[in-house]
């Protein structure tokens, strides 16, 4: 803060306010900065009140017929059928790509789909869909970005000056952003909103489970026993928060040799059945490690990726996700 204040200079002495010792009592409280500016020879200050300009009045009072936007106003206008979270526990298992493929598969079934990227410090959803433009602000709230197939997307990366800008925030700020993405974004009418959670059981996941009415969680793991161990932590968090688990998806289960067609288990034997049995949840499917998927995610063309493997997984998720047992998602 003192470094920033150093940019202000005394017009007569040509030195910064900090160098002249004019900045005192710097305090930071809940994002609000206060400090005392001590000016030599100044004993009191008089305020010259003038009439506000028309622009200043418009910022404070809405025009006739308009209402001032209140935080969370969009939430009451949204009509979202189901909210599904995708959670992994361990990073690097392809959770975000599974979330994106789920959204694409549901959209291909004719559903109205949105994706809320709750991975605030490591967002990747916009990159996969080739989105970069800042979402506009509407009269009620933020309008989500839209992919070429009509999937609505909201992510912190769409609000940053560059896609590789670091988000160095503590828990309260991260939680606040997630709540805004739910309550201040005009999602409109959706059949399903897919929420891409960050790895682990951090504040972000806790905020989602406490603030957003989830209908279920899809767990994503990989063949490694380590990934299975960590995803069990994620499952236990969901249970403690009273969020139902739709099932388990194993990603990067195997790859197919492009020359001979042999199935190769790159990360060793699958642990999916064992992990699903330990958790008592269904194994929804196993997804191969496909270089084409990686290329199309990098190119922002995940909607153009074609595979026969994920469609039955998406259908199982749609069939199982429900408000109460026995009620299908659509």
Predicted regions and their residues:
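Phosphate-binding P-loop
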Residues: 75-81
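Phosphate-binding/switch loop-helix module in NTP-utilizing enzymes
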Residues: 160-208, 227
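Short glycine/serine/threonine-rich phosphate/pyrophosphate-binding segments
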Residues: 92-101, 122-126, 197-205, 226-230
């Amino acid at each position: 803060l003192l470094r920033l204040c150093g940019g202000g200079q005394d017009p007569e002495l040509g030195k910064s306010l900090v160098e002249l010792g004019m900045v005192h009592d710097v305090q930071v409280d809940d994002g609000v900065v206060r400090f005392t500016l001590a000016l030599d020879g100044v004993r009191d200050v008089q305020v010259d009140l003038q009439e506000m300009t028309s622009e200043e009045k418009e910022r404070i009072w809405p025009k006739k017929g308009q209402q001032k936007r209140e935080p969370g106003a969009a939430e009451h206008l949204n009509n979202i059928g189901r909210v599904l979270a995708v959670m992994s526990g361990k990073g690097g298992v392809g959770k975000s790509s599974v979330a994106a493929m789920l959204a694409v598969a549901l959209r291909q079934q004719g559903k109205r789909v949105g994706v809320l990227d709750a991975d605030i410090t490591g967002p990747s959803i916009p990159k996969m869909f080739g989105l970069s433009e800042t979402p506009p602000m509407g009269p009620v709230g933020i309008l989500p970005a839209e992919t070429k197939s009509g999937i609505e997307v909201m992510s912190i990366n769409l609000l940053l000056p560059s896609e590789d800008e670091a988000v160095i925030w503590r828990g309260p700020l991260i939680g606040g952003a997630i709540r805004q993405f739910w309550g201040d974004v005009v999602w409109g009418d959706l059949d399903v909103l897919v929420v891409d959670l960050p790895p682990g059981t951090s504040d972000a996941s806790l905020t989602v489970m406490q603030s957003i009415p989830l209908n279920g969680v899809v767990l994503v793991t990989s063949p490694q026993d380590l990934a299975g161990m960590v995803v069990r932590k994620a499952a236990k968090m969901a249970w403690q928060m009273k969020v139902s688990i739709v099932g388990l998806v194993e990603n990067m289960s195997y790859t197919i040799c492009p020359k001979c067609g042999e199935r190769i288990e790159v990360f060793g034997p699958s642990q999916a059945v064992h992990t699903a049995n330990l958790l008592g949840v269904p194994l929804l499917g196993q997804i191969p490690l496909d270089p084409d998927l990686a290329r199309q995610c990098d190119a922002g063309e995940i909607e153009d990726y074609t595979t026969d493997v994920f469609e039955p997984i998406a259908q199982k998720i749609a069939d199982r996700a429900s408000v109460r047992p026995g009620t299908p998602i659509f």
